[in-house]
């Protein structure tokens, strides 16, 4: 992207969620201004409307992460692990009521419990899992973001 700008490209630049980190902003600098990208809501959690279904969970992650690692250190990548932990914390107790951990029956019960998770808000969206959908996210799992003044801004 930086090279495109240096060569005089004036068109709109779109990126993927893979650039949603502080290093991208640092390396690209002013050449990133105006870039649009879809990202998980956690990237702009503090800018989400109060009634956004992900705001509370995303802010919980951001606050805990930054309390441990420092202000401005949060990235979307760690939030994926956080979300997986919340998913497991929701499903494991259900599976443990049906079988002993470590057994074949427990693995099947855990799979069934994971596939049964509904309306679980996490940092990146709201999980609604099923036997045919192991991602479990819908449109609430992404927002449009624009680089403005070297920071991420929610596009409203």
Language-model region placement:
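Extracytosolic ligand-binding ectodomains
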Residues: 1-156
